[in-house]
Swiss-Prot record:
Function field: This protein binds to 23S rRNA in the presence of protein L20.
Protein name: Large ribosomal subunit protein bL21
Any GO molecular function: rRNA binding
Top-level division of the source organism's lineage: Bacteria
Gene name of this polypeptide: rplU
Keywords of the record: Ribonucleoprotein, Ribosomal protein, RNA-binding, rRNA-binding
Gene Ontology annotations of biological process type: translation
PANTHER family: 50S RIBOSOMAL PROTEIN L21, LARGE RIBOSOMAL SUBUNIT PROTEIN BL21M
Family that this chain belongs to: Belongs to the bacterial ribosomal protein bL21 family.
Cellular component annotations (GO), alphabetically ordered: cytoplasm; ribonucleoprotein complex; ribosome
Organism of this sequence: Geobacter metallireducens (strain ATCC 53774 / DSM 7210 / GS-15)
Subunit structure comment from the entry: Part of the 50S ribosomal subunit. Contacts protein L20.
Keyword field contains rRNA-binding: yes
Length: 102
C-alpha cells in the first residue's frame, strides 16, 4: 500500500517502512505525527482525492530533527567591487512511515 502525502508545500509518495525527509515539523525525536493531507491512496484499490481523501491519514515517527546540507548564495555586481557570499541550511525532519490508514 502506498500514499501520496502533501507536507511543506511538496508532494511525496510513501509506503510503510519508508524514511522521508520533509520540511521541519514541530515535535521531538520519538514523537508520533499524523499527516492528514493525503492526495491519493493506492493498493488493491486506488482512492484519488478531490483534492484530499477525507478518511485517510499517514502515521509516522520522528527519527531525526536537523538541518540539510549548506547551499551557497553568491551575488555580485558587474564592474563593481561588490560581492556577497551567504550560506543557508534549511531545517528538516526525518520521518519513518509506520502506518497508512485509508
Amino acid at each position: 500500500m502506498y500514499a501520496v502525502v502533501r507536507t511543506g508545500g511538496k508532494q511525496y509518495k510513501v509506503s510503510e517502512g519508508d524514511f522521508l525527509k520533509v520540511e521541519k515539523l514541530e515535535g521531538a525525536v520519538g514523537d508520533t505525527i499524523e499527516l492528514k493531507d493525503i492526495l491519493m491512496v493506492g493498493g488493491e484499490t486506488v482512492k484519488i482525492g478531490t483534492p484530499l481523501v477525507p478518511s485517510a491519514s499517514v502515521v509516522g515517527k520522528i527519527v531525526e530533527q536537523g538541518k540539510d546540507k549548506k547551499i551557497l548564495v553568491f551575488k555580485s555586481k558587474k564592474r563593481k567591487d561588490s560581492k556577497k557570499l551567504r550560506g543557508h541550511r534549511q531545517p528538516r525532519t526525518v520521518l519513518k512511515i509506520e502506518k497508512i490508514n485509508g
